[in-house]
Regions:
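Conserved small/polar residues in nucleotide/adenosyl-binding loops
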Residues: 161-167
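Noncatalytic, basic helical substrate-engagement surface that gates or grips nucleic-acid strands
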Residues: 2-133, 141-158
């Protein structure tokens, strides 16, 4: 079995930075890149099943207070129009999440204390004999790449395998 493991928020939110333009264009591009990434994985990598991994609050914050603290500072510094864009993107993402949860046969994983990368790593551990394609721009996934695990960056359309490991700046 070959699983496509989607770092869903990463894929969706990174895609909006690919194009300049109005909010509708950015939202449309986020959908386009996310869905095209899935189509490419399905066809080129011959995936059998898609697993959407969704964000929860990280357990790491309970042990290391500064963990991702700069993200809140970044959000606090947004202009009103950027705040509106952020709000619309989260609303759109929630609608996408609802769609894949209720209208597809894809697996959807979410836990209140785990980030998507935790869920992806856990899924791979639970299915060691299967093949996995991680869809994400996150360079931290390089540590999971092996003969049975590869990574596809849906924004740059670059794939990494155990034979072509990414550098820290290339993902």
């Amino acid at each position: 079995m070959k699983y496509a493991l989607i770092d869903t928020a990463n894929t969706f939110f990174r895609a909006r930075h690919v194009v300049r333009g109005d909010l509708d264009t950015k939202v449309g591009m986020a959908f386009h890149i996310t869905l095209n990434s899935l189509k490419k994985i399905w066809h080129e990598f011959d995936a059998d099943h898609i697993v959407f991994c969704l964000e929860g609050r990280s357990w790491r914050k309970d042990f290391y207070e500064p963990y991702k603290r700069n993200r809140q500072e970044f959000r606090d510094a947004l202009t009103p129009s950027q705040q509106e864009e952020e709000k619309v993107f989260w609303e759109t993402f929630d609608a996408f999440k609802e769609f894949v949860t209720t209208k597809t046969n894809c697996t959807v994983l979410q836990h209140s204390q785990l980030e998507a990368d935790d869920l992806i790593a856990g899924w791979i551990q639970l299915h060691p004999e299967d093949e996995h394609v991680i869809v994400s721009t996150d360079g931290d996934f390089a540590q999971l790449i092996s003969p049975k695990v590869s990574q596809y960056n849906g924004v740059s359309t670059v794939s990494y395998t155990h034979l072509t490991l990414p550098t820290s700046r290339s993902v």
